[in-house]
Amino acid sequence: MAAIDDRTGHGASGGAFAGLPPVREVPVADVASAVRSSGRRLVVLDDDPTGTQTVAGVPVLTDWSVEDIRWALRQDTPAFYILTNTRSLDARAAGERDRDVVRALVDAARIEHQRFVVVSRSDSTLRGHFPLETDVIADTLALRAGIEVDGIVVAPAYIEGGRVTVDSVHWLRAGDTAVPVGESEFAKDATFGFVSSELRAYVEEKTFGRWRAAEVPRVTLEDLRTGGVDEVAAILASARGRRPVVCDALCDDDLRVLALAAIRVEHAGRVLLYRVGPSFVRARAGLEARASLTPAEVAAIRSAGQQPSARPLGGDAGGDGASLAEASSHGLVVVGSHVAQSTRQLAALLRHGGVEAIELDVATLLDPGQSPVAIASAADAVVAGLRSADVVVSTSREVLTGPDPTASLAIARAVSASLVDLVRKVTGRVRPGFVVAKGGITSSDVATAGLGIRRAWVRGTLLPGIVSLWEPVADATAGAAAHPPIPFVVFAGNVGDEDDLVSVVATLRGAP
């Protein structure tokens, strides 16, 4: 373990964090100007919804029809997100989805006469379908648009989440210490496990030797801070034939140097594809790191979503299909993530009190004979609870895995489908004042299948750099009569301090 400073590495106990060069400060305005001059929109294919937690004021799509993408392209923003949710899919389905999204993007951009740059945003702890996704995206760009990718920029840093890269080794911070990502619980993931913390070795591991570590160029902190844009641009420009380039970052200024270099290389005619963590998107789009939303701002967003519905509800309302939704000022918190940090945060919220707690047994949810009854019973309990309190629904904390990664992913999908069924049954009868989803797969499925969100605006975060608040676009919410827009909070499973879920719920309540 090694103690580190966010920007300089000072205070470290030697090793990779000793003697780092001083930060080269880059104003956000410089990157924003370069982005405008480039004339290219940043299109972020997000493999789960947590990638939006570093940005504000940008659209997010959960559907990728040509019309939806055209809507996003017409918004006056430097970037927008398309939630592909591919991290929850097996390899074949993930590839098919990426292919469909890129085809629709190319067609929409052609109609709107827009140029674009594609970002494959993935996990800052290195889980996900790599290199599958960048391969499929590059192939589809070549076939559909004649665009040949030269280099793949690999920059997994998530500064606010404590995921940083120094000397090509990716680290996870916990308090004032850090551990190499290959030694973390995330490296043991049942679906996306790996062993390498050094990014060049990680590329070799995941590509099964297609790119050997010695053949992978790298951008170090020395390059970023001493060489600057000129040196970094030269490294990026050297990539050909979709060669990955791995990149250090310890602070936002490092990422802004990288962004300016990338824009310069693109202006010179090179095509870069990005496989990155959340922080790079903000830097490359030229967006400011905004302060967390204030209680007053959150209250305004909540009030916009609490206008009473004037139309009848059907389907999952559970009655004759003609009853009106009952509005509640209380919120629904859905915790599907089972990683250790989510479990600690859930326990803290339950200790804090003021919530009704309902736990769903995972083994029961996986039993076709028992699951429907368990979900219906839980939905009744949630509806009753929302009349007087915020309600927390969580899955049991034991981790059930299958004999192989595909089977383990199928278990996670089945559990998530049960949570979606529950949310649909609840919101068909009661409209919560807000919904919080904890965990990547949980967040995506609750947003799309549970709440029917197709288009939304990312309004900001509830904590610095983490926990994103979406405001759905009313006329693009599927089944708007049955599911009026409800403020939706995306809370990644693997980020935040122990009391952060408590803080998020308190802010949404409007508590001091």
Predicted regions and their residues:
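Conserved, well-ordered active-site substructure
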Residues: V58, P432-F434, K438-D500
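C-terminal structural cap/anchor segments
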Residues: D380-G440
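Cap/lid and interdomain-hinge subdomains that line or gate substrate/regulatory clefts
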Residues: A32-D46, Q53, W71-A72, P78, ...
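N-terminal basic/disordered segments at the start of proteins
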Residues: G9, S13-Q75, E160
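Short acidic, glycine/serine/threonine-rich loops at helix termini
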Residues: T54-G57, H129-E133, R163-W171, R256-A261, ...
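Conserved, well-structured core segments that form the ligand-binding/active-site neighborhood
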Residues: V169-A378
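N-terminal short beta-loop-beta anion/metal-coordinating cradle
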Residues: Q53-L83, S377-V383, R387-D390, V458-A480
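Short beta-strand segments
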Residues: L45-D46, Y81-T84, S120-R121, V153-A157, ...
